[in-house]
Amino acid sequence: KDIFAVGNAAYAMYEKAPENIQVVFPMHHGVIARFHEMQYLLRALLKREGRYPNGAEYVIAAPTDVTEVEKKAFYDLVHHSAARAKTVRIVDRAIADAVGIGLDVFSAKGIFVVNFGGETTELSVLSGGKTVLSRLLPVGGAALDEAIVGSVRHNKEFLIGRITAEQLRWQCGILKNTNRRKLTVAGRDLAMGVPGARQISDGLVRAAMKDSLSEIVRAIQSMIERTPPDVRSEILKSGIY
């Protein structure tokens, strides 16, 4: 099969590509689902850098709550690529997240990290450079987008795509924004069967996301309750990242 585009260029074709072009997602729920396509994506990213850093050390951040087979797939991806890696290490994504935002994971007695991704949300409690508790929820941006699509269809009799739903989520779904606003989007009028436009309110978008976000909040509360008391006291001081 020929590959025409990767990354954002490929995503822009999602739901718009002709029948002879298939848009696929190499990752599914935080792990590699299509190894061949993931190899091509890695190769494209390395080419974008203009060189293959031969002999480099690679560190891959993988979800904590996945199987050893799924973790090995990440290792094999780099080890058998053109990167010619000197070493390949798999680390807990929560540790990498904390280091990435400048936290001292080794001296901290209690850190709570929430990684909200495309298809999953990972909750992790860290202490002394180790993962104390971790949970991978099958809820992410994609679930919110699908909920928005369904809500617009039900309430407006109007069909929008996931990319449009994602734009609504970013522009109207900010929970701290108290200003009421509406956004005009393109789609298909289901009653007439023709293309059209509709104004979608931020209230409709937020209501669509409520169930999924509530699930994440409940999971956070449950994990805090299961956290050892000394670690929990530190988290209550520092907050959630």
Predicted segment positions?
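Nucleotide/phosphate-binding catalytic cleft detector across ATP-hydrolyzing
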Residues: 1-116, 126-241
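Short acidic, Gly/Ser-rich segments with clustered Asp/Glu that frequently serve as metal-coordination loops
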Residues: 118-120
